[in-house]
């Protein structure tokens, strides 16, 4: 079996494992009258006429290898919808577990790349984040420098010293604090690693540099003509750098020792948050690996954490989240708008978490969506559970109508 074949086999096992976990979660939550299989059968019926399509975005994976061919950096680049210039930079932790906790083995994305190369890495990223990539590209430090040259220099605020291993010794490349970085220095920060240290020790500085890149782009640094084909990640970066760019990092969750007996440098992605942001900026690219129904989730401005909790609750029962809208209607109780009336009993059972639920039929359903879940104040105004995720950047959450700020300052919901 080839290395790539092993990745496909692992990815299939991952999806099957997620569905098994979803079925167990359903039973644990007492939802005995609903089965994931019946959800699946309902969700796969023919699309009703006159559905609304989501705007099309281009999603690419940019991987950076250091001089030893170690996976040193990873980010998703997402275009704005349609033919707009600009986009999103979404750094992905390279230590994320590609198995999402299924099986006996924890396999970091760094290990996937080392074994299966960039194609295997792309498959793993798609599985972890439930997103479909249009393209993927691996660049060397020199190639990364050329790619980032149009935005350099950048003004970065480094949370900690940038350290690297030089001649078997740890040295400080850049001290913590404000600093100006040219393109070569940007790549140094993105690839620097002290041998033996955890990947998470690098993350604050990596996220800070991606934020600095987004800020440096301003209203555009490159030339891009609307309608120009985007066939490579290089094309996508050029398009993104031609307009306003937003950076958003993904937090991680420590893996319990009993699930990582080998003590590997592996973390779990905060999947609820990652899916929430991706379903916000690239709904047309979201996949549906779960056997349950596929949702669009809406909430009015100001409820980012509550919306994340709702996404997490849906993922737990094996549902899929394709779209998220932070500018939903203000309602007293939550409302579920069905694409098909026959899904009513399943939706009511699925959504006991959200309290009183008004159920109706969506007269303008979205393509690929079974249910539009509009969260009401009865659910949104409840006290949130104590956070269990760990993040590597300090951020404050607010809401506006259409923009999302960088991950190291204020996070604003689109």
Regions found by a protein language model. Name each.
Residues 2-400, 410-414:
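Non-catalytic, solvent-exposed segments at the cell envelope interface
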């Amino acid at each position: 079996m080839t290395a790539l074949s092993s990745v496909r086999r692992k990815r299939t096992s991952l999806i099957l494992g997620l569905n098994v976990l979803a079925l167990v979660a359903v039973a644990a939550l007492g939802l005995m009258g609903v089965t994931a299989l019946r959800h699946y059968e309902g969700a796969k019926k023919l699309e009703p006429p006159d559905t609304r399509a989501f705007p099309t975005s281009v999603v690419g994976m940019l991987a950076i290898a250091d001089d030893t061919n170690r996976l040193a950096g990873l980010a998703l680049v997402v275009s704005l919808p349609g033919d707009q210039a600009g986009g999103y930079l979404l750094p992905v932790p390279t230590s994320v577990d590609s198995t999402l906790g299924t099986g006996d083995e924890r396999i970091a994305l760094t290990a996937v790349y080392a074994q299966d190369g960039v194609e295997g890495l792309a498959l793993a990223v798609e599985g972890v984040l439930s997103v479909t990539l249009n393209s993927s590209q691996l660049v060397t430090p020199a190639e990364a420098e050329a790619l980032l040259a149009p935005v350099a220099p950048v003004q970065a605020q480094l949370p900690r010293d940038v350290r690297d291993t030089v001649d078997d010794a740890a040295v400080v490349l850049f001290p913590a604090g404000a600093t100006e970085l040219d393109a070569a220095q940007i790549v140094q920060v993105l690839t620097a690693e002290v041998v033996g240290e955890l990947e998470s020790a690098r993350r604050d500085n990596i996220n800070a540099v991606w934020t600095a890149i987004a800020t440096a782009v301003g209203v555009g640094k490159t030339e891009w003509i609307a309608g120009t084909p985007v066939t490579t990640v290089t094309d996508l970066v050029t398009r993104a750098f031609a307009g306003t760019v937003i950076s958003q990092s993904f937090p991680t969750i420590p893996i319990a020792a009993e699930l990582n007996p080998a003590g590997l440098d592996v973390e779990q992605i905060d999947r609820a948050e990652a899916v929430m942001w991706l379903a916000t900026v690239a709904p047309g690219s979201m996949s549906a690996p779960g056997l349950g129904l596929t949702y669009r989730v809406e909430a009015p401005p100001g409820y980012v954490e509550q919306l994340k909790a709702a996404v997490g609750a849906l993922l737990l029962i094996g549902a899929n989240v394709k779209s998220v809208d932070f500018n939903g209607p203000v309602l007293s109780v939550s409302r579920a708008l069905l694409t098909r009336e026959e899904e009513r009993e399943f939706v009511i059972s699925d959504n006991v978490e959200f309290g009183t639920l008004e159920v109706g039929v969506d007269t303008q359903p979205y393509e690929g969506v079974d249910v539009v879940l509009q969260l009401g104040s009865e659910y949104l105004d409840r006290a949130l559970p104590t956070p269990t995720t760990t993040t590597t950047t300090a951020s404050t959450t607010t809401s506006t109508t259409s923009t999302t700020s960088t991950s190291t300052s204020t996070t604003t919901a689109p």
